[in-house]
Amino acid sequence: MTIEQSAPESQSSAARFAVKVDLVVIGAGQAGLSSAYHLRRLGFEPDRDFVVLDQAPAPGGAWQFRWPSLTLATVNRVHDLPGMRFDEIVGTESDTVQASAAVPRYYAAYEERYDLRVHRPVKVSVVCDRGERLRVETDAGAFSARGIVNATGTWETPYIPEYPGADRFRGRQLHTKDYRTADAFRGQHVVVVGGGISAIQLLDEISQATTTTWVTRREPQFREGPFTEEFGRRIVAMVEDKVRQGLPPGSVASNTGSLPLTPAVRAMRDRGVLNRLPMFSEITETGIRWADGTEQRADVILWCTGFRSSLDHLAPLQLREEGGGITMTGRLATQVARDPRIHLVGYGPSASTIGANRAGGAAARELTQYLEMSPAEVRSSG
């Protein structure tokens, strides 16, 4: 199956016709690749039984867009994809390697080894219910599918909260997604907003190049040492409970309630960088202002306020509850309760790399069983 970008003159005909396929996997990051791998293991063939569509221009998921100074030593652990170790591709002495180079190299090798035939760049614009099938509209044409594994992650949906005066600020407002290097801020005062791991990492870098102010909504709590596997399992269980109730999963920081007190964080504290201030009440033309009238001049406001799940293309399916969450079911909470033909892998408890691996397997098995799909060799011998 060859998928090409639709030319403008063919869009009207594309609206009438759709390529029929059993399953569409949307996204080719950790969650999407894991799901595709497990579909293959179950005997289903890419480009015949399922297709994998990825919006990114190259393998690597969101990792290919991360800032250059983010190395394998400073990221949360990158877990192996099923069937292929990470160190097979990047080696065991790779802490100083850029994450934006190493992980894409690993994903590319993985796609090739298992012949997953990812189609890119293909952007899914909308998914609609067409009775027994789901219509998946993309900028490369339409697909008619019996089921969907959605693995679109969060990178394309940065979250910036609304604050009074934001539209009149004369400086720059950026998000974590926009960050490249601290050198870009030399000679400027940067307000870093956010209390998560990314906020701490960027505050560390930027504060070594220029002056900073750090503000958070909640008082940050630090805990000794890195997070343990047991602690991680408790957090995953907490998030799983939320999504099974139809509640929004929340950010990692909001669920962990604390940040690891690493050597780098201790060094920041010794430098006086962790002088956290509460959230300001408004943004002015030249900076920020708190409720008591105190002002801080700023050239840049860097919003390290996280991301939201990239699910806008699923809006016509009306999967959300009144509170904004999606009620999930299934063994690992990947199946959408309102429409069991849809699995969200990388949402809620499967948002971590290790969670995505396990969830990809569960989604592949549960979805093919629900749709009563049989591998080609079984169909041909029946």
Named regions from a protein language model:
Residues 86-94:
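Glycine-/proline-rich flexible loop or hinge segments
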Residues 2-56, 61-64, 69, 93-382:
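Flavin (primarily FAD) cofactor-binding/catalytic cores of flavoenzymes
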Residues 58-87:
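Redox-cofactor-proximal catalytic regions of oxidoreductases
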